[in-house]
Regions:
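Intrinsically disordered, low-complexity charged segments of secreted bacterial virulence
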Residues: 1-264
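Membrane-active amphipathic alpha-helices enriched in small hydrophobic residues
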Residues: 253-283, 287-288
Length: 288
């Protein structure tokens, strides 16, 4: 990661919710296109050499491109879902805010405090030695305190490094198969747009005249295999996120109820105070 990070669970959840909604819209917009291609391909009354060329073109080109877009959307969604869920293994608080600046500050503070404890322990030992001829006193043992502080310092260091490694891992994955699929899809679409295709004379296999189509098909197959192999994990991660959003909704409702109760109490207290003030003046006063 470049610069200092600040992990905010609420922001990541909001981003997940927004992108999930947007991608659901995209998928719903693609479905009529897929259905239209299927219907035209199965239309028995649409016959003839040119008609068969069009049907083959729709099946091999349009359906491949539509499927590629769907796979890219699903792969992106899955990758982010796994990325988001993985943070709960490091910190389970639904509303966690993790600034690297704070972690590094705690680490530095622990280092300083450990040094201070060592210095203080040495001063105490020296002072006791100065009166050893008068009274024998055992110097306090600072070992356990320093050991506990060292443990805190190490835990903070490890936690910070875990986040750095985790971000680097997912950045690498994002620049891997997902990026390759998107780049191949864009290159394939660009070549079709630039060179065009004679639909009425299209023959089966002509799609591979597009130099990027074989690579795109391979990336789609790889993505499909990944989604199949991780189907169970995807389902569990989706359930986890549903539980998170349900808990956040419950917490928000509870917070609103408590806020409303506080406002009612405050309003009631103000009303009582107002009544007492009016009674104290001897009667109700008209508001002009």
């Amino acid at each position: 990661m470049s610069g200092q990070y600040k992990i905010m669970y609420s922001s990541m959840d909001q981003f997940y919710d927004q992108t999930n909604g947007r991608m659901a819209e995209w998928v719903s917009q693609l479905e009529p296109w897929v259905k239209a291609c299927e219907n035209l391909g199965n239309m028995e009354c649409y016959q003839g050499k040119s008609a068969e060329s069009v049907k083959t073109y729709l099946k091999e080109v349009h359906m491949t491109l539509l499927t590629s877009i769907q796979q890219a959307i699903q792969l992106y969604r899955t990758k982010y879902l796994f990325y988001r869920e993985g943070y709960y293994d490091m910190e389970g608080d639904l509303y966690a805010v993790i600034p690297q600046k704070t972690l590094l500050s705690v680490k530095d503070r622990m280092k300083t405090e450990i040094e201070d404890v060592s210095d203080s322990s040495l001063i105490v030992q020296t002072s006791l030695l100065n009166v050893s001829d008068l009274i024998a006193l055992q110097a306090p043992n600072s070992y356990y305190l320093k050991d506990s502080m060292e443990e805190v310092k190490q835990n903070v260091t490890d936690f910070n490094q875990n986040i750095i490694d985790y971000e680097a891992q997912h950045k690498s994955e994002a620049n891997g198969e997902l990026a390759d699929l998107l780049q191949s899809l864009f290159a394939t679409l660009t070549e079709y747009y630039t060179n065009g295709t004679n639909v009425t004379s299209y023959q089966s296999g002509d799609c591979f005249g597009n130099s990027h189509m074989p690579e795109l098909c391979q990336h789609v197959l790889t993505a499909n295999e990944y989604l199949k192999e991780n189907a169970e994990e995807i389902e569990l991660a989706e359930v986890k996120m549903q539980e998170v959003f349900a808990q956040q909704y419950e917490d928000a409702c509870k917070a609103r109820e408590e806020e409303g109760a506080i406002k009612l109490l405050t309003g009631g207290a103000a009303a009582i105070t107002g009544i007492l003030a009016i009674v104290g003046t001897g009667g109700w006063q008209l508001r002009l």
